[in-house]
Amino acid sequence: MTKHIAILRGDGIGPEIVAETVRVLDKLIEQGLDAGYEYAPLGGEAYDEYGHPYPEFTQNLCRKADAVLLGAVGSPQYDNLDRPLRPERGLLAIRKDLNLFANLRPAVLYPELANASTLKPEIVAGLDILIVRELTGDIYFGEPRGIRVLENGEREGYNTMKYSESEIRRIAHVAFQSAQKRSKKVCSVGKANVLETTELWREIFEEIGKEYPDVELSHMYVDNAAMQLVRAPKQFDVIATGNIFGDILSDEASMLTGSLGMLPSASLDENGKGLYEPSHGSAPDIAGQNKANPLATILSLAMLLRYSLNDEA
């Protein structure tokens, strides 16, 4: 049965790196991969065409597709738009719409890039970490949120950090199952000493961990985890954490490899459908110059084949 891929070029270097990746996809289809694809806009490209970063046309295509491949979103020209209309909101919206709750971010050091890392080679040689980040909850989506004026006339910004038990359970299973295919270690990262949200996170990880006796579970406060990633990163196998902490730690871990531009990522739902994109941004400063490296997007295609199409091509 033919699988359908929605391809979102996005902004900045997105169209360039996607074009090179589609060349690879076309070759695989020529060689027998039973898949087809269709393009749709997201982010700034979508705003220019439809007035919204995640328009109905794109929603319908992505909902029907078996997997989604994205270039990148974001450009300074949209920074003055109302927040709900900015390109990045399109990315948040598609994750929420498709219920893509599990973000897998590998941080692997290729031997050829050992000297590009800012850490000593002996610290990072052989590095292979997987960060499993929960994507649909936490402070990015918690309500209430906003900016209000207090009685004394001072403005106050406020957000809500929260996680439900079911949200934590499903990301815990992803983390433990990922570890079973690797070195069988999960480090749960939070701030349970001051945040009740991550106190519950820790309790549930302990509970779920009993279902995976072959996997070693440890816990670490996020500030210590950020330090340990620089001090001794090879102690980690799978790091499991919430949305905001994962956002920060995954970028930190990626730079240990010498180049953010070489790493793919996957965001999955409970059935294996996913959004696949490079870990780097839209790099508008080099857009249109044909010098953006497409490798991270090509590797994202490889993850798409593995996780959503069950094909190791």
Curated annotation (Swiss-Prot):
<keyword id="KW-0464">Manganese</keyword>
<keyword id="KW-0520">NAD</keyword>
<comment type="similarity">
    <text>Belongs to the isocitrate and isopropylmalate dehydrogenases family. LeuB type 1 subfamily.</text>
</comment>
<keyword id="KW-0560">Oxidoreductase</keyword>
<keyword id="KW-0100">Branched-chain amino acid biosynthesis</keyword>
<feature type="binding site">
    <location>
        <position position="223"/>
    </location>
    <ligand>
        <name>Mg(2+)</name>
    </ligand>
</feature>
<feature type="binding site">
    <location>
        <position position="247"/>
    </location>
    <ligand>
        <name>Mg(2+)</name>
    </ligand>
</feature>
<feature type="binding site">
    <location>
        <position position="133"/>
    </location>
    <ligand>
        <name>substrate</name>
    </ligand>
</feature>
<dbReference type="InterPro" id="IPR004429">
    <property type="entry name" value="Isopropylmalate_DH"/>
</dbReference>
<comment type="function">
    <text>Catalyzes the oxidation of 3-carboxy-2-hydroxy-4-methylpentanoate (3-isopropylmalate) to 3-carboxy-4-methyl-2-oxopentanoate. The product decarboxylates to 4-methyl-2 oxopentanoate.</text>
</comment>
<keyword id="KW-0460">Magnesium</keyword>
<comment type="pathway">
    <text>Amino-acid biosynthesis; L-leucine biosynthesis; L-leucine from 3-methyl-2-oxobutanoate: step 3/4.</text>
</comment>
<dbReference type="GO" id="GO:0000287">
    <property type="term" value="F:magnesium ion binding"/>
</dbReference>
<dbReference type="GO" id="GO:0005829">
    <property type="term" value="C:cytosol"/>
</dbReference>
<feature type="site" description="Important for catalysis">
    <location>
        <position position="191"/>
    </location>
</feature>
<keyword id="KW-0479">Metal-binding</keyword>
<feature type="site" description="Important for catalysis">
    <location>
        <position position="140"/>
    </location>
</feature>
<feature type="binding site">
    <location>
        <position position="223"/>
    </location>
    <ligand>
        <name>substrate</name>
    </ligand>
</feature>
<protein>
    <recommendedName>
        <fullName>3-isopropylmalate dehydrogenase</fullName>
        <ecNumber>1.1.1.85</ecNumber>
    </recommendedName>
</protein>
<feature type="binding site">
    <location>
        <begin position="281"/>
        <end position="293"/>
    </location>
    <ligand>
        <name>NAD(+)</name>
    </ligand>
</feature>
<dbReference type="InterPro" id="IPR019818">
    <property type="entry name" value="IsoCit/isopropylmalate_DH_CS"/>
</dbReference>
<dbReference type="InterPro" id="IPR024084">
    <property type="entry name" value="IsoPropMal-DH-like_dom"/>
</dbReference>
<dbReference type="GO" id="GO:0003862">
    <property type="term" value="F:3-isopropylmalate dehydrogenase activity"/>
</dbReference>
<dbReference type="Pfam" id="PF00180">
    <property type="entry name" value="Iso_dh"/>
</dbReference>
<feature type="binding site">
    <location>
        <position position="251"/>
    </location>
    <ligand>
        <name>Mg(2+)</name>
    </ligand>
</feature>
<keyword id="KW-0432">Leucine biosynthesis</keyword>
<keyword id="KW-0028">Amino-acid biosynthesis</keyword>
<feature type="binding site">
    <location>
        <position position="95"/>
    </location>
    <ligand>
        <name>substrate</name>
    </ligand>
</feature>
<dbReference type="GO" id="GO:0051287">
    <property type="term" value="F:NAD binding"/>
</dbReference>
<feature type="binding site">
    <location>
        <position position="105"/>
    </location>
    <ligand>
        <name>substrate</name>
    </ligand>
</feature>
<dbReference type="GO" id="GO:0009098">
    <property type="term" value="P:L-leucine biosynthetic process"/>
</dbReference>
<comment type="subunit">
    <text>Homodimer.</text>
</comment>
<keyword id="KW-0963">Cytoplasm</keyword>
